[in-house]
């Protein structure tokens, strides 16, 4: 089975070993589980990574709850990615996720009424979630009040994050999160 009937997931390799267990590329007929994972902890890592991206894309006001629109946006963005890079869009997405997920974050600890920032390692599932959220947010921000379509903006964001380009919203936010964590060590 292929994603969107076009892209084979069996040839995709996950470069980052820490998130390998949390990026699911098992073949599915339809990328729609209907929220069966919602009540169980850590079950969202069993969702296909493209479905998780689709779910992140339907978070903004206009597309809230409209999965078919988000499905079409991601499908057309994958076609654009393939036409620009001549690669499998799934492998480009997996590289983008591993490049855009922050490895270190900051938590706030209270010591006697004083708040002290402390750097902590990020869990692998949170890295994947944060990377997908930053990619979707960057695409929405690039297309807001712009003539460019959301499909083009999503494709640009994924390609830039896969190439570790600082022009990518996701990569620049990841760098700023890690910079703050480095200062809080």
Swiss-Prot record:
Family that this chain belongs to: Belongs to the universal ribosomal protein uS7 family.
Cited PANTHER family: RIBOSOMAL PROTEIN S7
Protein origin, superkingdom: Archaea
Name of protein: Small ribosomal subunit protein uS7
InterPro entries, A to Z: Ribosomal_uS7, Ribosomal_uS7_arc, Ribosomal_uS7_dom, Ribosomal_uS7_dom_sf, Ribosomal_uS7_euk/arc
Record note on quaternary structure: Part of the 30S ribosomal subunit.
NCBIfam families, A to Z: PRK04027.1, uS7_euk_arch
Cellular component aspect of the GO annotation: small ribosomal subunit
Annotated keywords: Ribonucleoprotein, Ribosomal protein, RNA-binding, rRNA-binding
Gene Ontology BP annotations: translation
Cited function: One of the primary rRNA binding proteins, it binds directly to 16S rRNA where it nucleates assembly of the head domain of the 30S subunit. Is located at the subunit interface close to the decoding center.
Pfam families according to UniProt: Ribosomal_S7
One example GO MF annotation: rRNA binding
């Amino acid at each position: 089975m292929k994603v969107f009937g076009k892209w084979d997931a069996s040839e995709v390799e996950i470069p980052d070993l820490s998130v390998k267990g949390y990026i699911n590329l098992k073949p599915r007929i339809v990328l729609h589980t209907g929220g069966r994972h919602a009540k169980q902890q850590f079950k969202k890592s069993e969702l296909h990574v493209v479905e998780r991206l689709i779910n992140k894309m339907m978070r903004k006001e206009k597309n809230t709850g409209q999965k078919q629109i988000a499905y079409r946006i991601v499908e057309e963005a994958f076609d654009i990615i393939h036409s620009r890079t001549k690669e499998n869009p799934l492998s480009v997405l997996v590289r983008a996720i591993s490049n855009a997920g922050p490895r270190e974050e900051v938590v706030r600890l209270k010591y006697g009424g004083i708040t002290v920032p402390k750097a902590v390692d990020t869990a692998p599932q949170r890295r994947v979630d944060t990377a997908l959220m930053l990619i979707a947010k960057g695409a929405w921000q690039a297309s807001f009040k712009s003539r460019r379509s959301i499909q083009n903006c999503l494709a640009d964001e994924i390609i830039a994050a896969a190439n570790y380009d600082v022009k990518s919203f996701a990569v620049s936010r990841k760098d700023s999160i890690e910079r703050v964590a480095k200062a809080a060590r």
